């Protein structure tokens, strides 16, 4: 019997997770992994661009056979060459491109943090909603137990002819409604569980006991992660706009090419004793007039930058308002806990009195049923208020630009 008991416990133990474990699973899911790969791809692209500005070494060879031979055109010719090319100056575009990539990478990193925080907040909401539903389920089950007991009690009185059928049917009706409500609660619990399994990518079984750290001393040091990402995107667009100005300046390249060739004549004598040639050159190119092409390219990118800056300022102000609303919501949630606690005490006290009067035949079952419902509703509402406070704390941490997983205990 002990072996069977242990066998049933093992799966529960293996798949049971608290809030910290659920969040850790979530921030390593496939969506996050996809974002990481995109960020790595951007970093590799930046490395490629950097390498593109280093000297380039090329080599090549050719072999040709001509139909007609002339003194300057051998019958057969072999050629091999090697060349080195270096962009000495590109009008300053290189450094603006570098700045653009670096800020884009920083934006990608902050976007990744924002994604993790968004997912973490979603999991936290699911977790505490799950606990609230479990508390509501427990209260509803106890209400059903009370209603079932009263159904048996009133049923005996009805069979004895000491009470009317409508008194019994009121209890039966309330019991059936409570059973349906319990089924709806269980469906909501299953829905949350499935949503968590979808986000985490694994089977979950939730354990309670997790909370978030106190936030009374929390100071906002940085904007929200997505706002930081927008800021870096804006900086990147500014760098791209500045890069367009390079069209006003010259480009300078350095080249060195070494050629080796072997000429084979059938009819003529090769009079050229040299079989190699080395050419070193410095080249400058300066576009003096292009009908305003560079001007309009710059203005186009500058307008994109200004649009991005306006969007950033708008979202930043909106995020500041969201934080202030979250703080007010948190204070209301704390007050709600005190309110529901007082309501619970009053409901429990009233229920005990009304139950005693009902069982002694001093009042009808309408008042009793109302009192019973109010008691268990008060229990579930109080526990929900406690759980909602944790969600409010998480929302403040989220809007304060902090990583949620660091505040779970």
Question: Which functions belong to the PLM regions below?
Answer:
Residues 99-102, 165-176, 299, 365-376:
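Short, charged, amphipathic alpha-helical segments
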Residues 35, 57-61, 230, 252-256, ...:
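Membrane-embedded beta-strand positions of outer-membrane beta-barrel proteins
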Residues 27-31, 43-55, 82-100, 110-117, ...:
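A glycine-/polar-enriched beta->alpha junction
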Residues 21, 116-228, 233-235, 241, ...:
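Periplasmic alpha-helical coiled-coil/stalk elements that build and connect Gram-negative outer-membrane
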Residues 60-93, 97-99, 256-293, 297, ...:
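Small/polar, glycine/serine/threonine/aspartate-rich low-complexity segments that form flexible
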Residues 381-409:
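Acidic, low-complexity, intrinsically disordered peripheral segments
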Residues 4-13:
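Sec-dependent N-terminal signal peptides
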Residues 16-58, 162-166, 197-242, 249, ...:
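Bacterial Sec-pathway N-terminal export signals of envelope proteins
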């Amino acid at each position: 019997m002990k072996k069977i008991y242990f066998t049933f416990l093992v799966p529960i133990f293996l798949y049971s997770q608290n809030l910290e474990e659920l969040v850790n699973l979530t921030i390593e899911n496939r969506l996050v992994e996809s974002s990481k790969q995109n960020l790595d791809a951007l970093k590799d692209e930046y490395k490629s661009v950097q390498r593109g500005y280093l000297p380039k070494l090329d080599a090549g060879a050719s072999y040709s056979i001509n139909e007609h031979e002339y003194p300057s055109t051998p019958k057969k010719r072999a050629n091999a060459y090697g060349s080195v090319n270096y962009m000495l100056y590109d009008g300053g575009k290189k450094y603006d491109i570098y700045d653009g990539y670096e800020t884009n990478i920083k934006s990608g990193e902050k976007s990744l943090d924002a994604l993790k925080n968004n997912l973490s907040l979603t999991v936290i909401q699911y977790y505490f909603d799950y606990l609230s539903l479990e508390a509501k389920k427990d209260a509803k089950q106890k209400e059903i137990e009370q209603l079932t007991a009263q159904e048996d009690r009133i049923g005996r009185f009805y069979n004895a002819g000491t009470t009317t059928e409508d008194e019994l049917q009121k209890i039966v009706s309330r019991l059936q409604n409570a059973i349906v409500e319990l089924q709806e609660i269980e469906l909501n619990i299953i829905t949350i569980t499935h949503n968590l399994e979808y986000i985490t990518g694994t089977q979950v079984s939730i354990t309670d006991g997790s909370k978030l750290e106190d936030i009374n001393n929390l100071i906002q040091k940085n904007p929200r992660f997505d706002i930081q990402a927008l800021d870096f995107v804006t900086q990147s667009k500014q760098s791209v706009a500045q890069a367009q100005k390079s069209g006003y300046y010259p480009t300078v390249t350095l080249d060195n090419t070494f050629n080796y060739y072997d000429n084979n004549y059938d009819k003529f004598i090769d009079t050229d004793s040299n079989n190699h040639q080395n050419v070193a050159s410095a080249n400058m190119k300066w576009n003096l007039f292009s009908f305003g092409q560079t001007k309009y390219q710059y203005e186009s990118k500058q307008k994109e930058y200004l649009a991005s800056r306006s969007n950033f300022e708008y979202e930043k102000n909106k995020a500041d308002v969201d934080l202030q609303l979250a703080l007010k919501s948190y204070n209301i949630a704390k007050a709600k806990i005190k309110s529901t606690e007082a309501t619970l005490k009053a409901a429990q006290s009233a229920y005990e009195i009304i139950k005693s009067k009902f069982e002694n035949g001093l009042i009808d079952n309408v008042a009793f049923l109302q009192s019973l419902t109010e008691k268990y509703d008060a229990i579930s509402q109080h526990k929900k208020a406690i759980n909602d406070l944790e969600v409010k704390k998480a929302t403040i941490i989220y809007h304060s630009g902090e990583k949620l997983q660091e505040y779970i205990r």
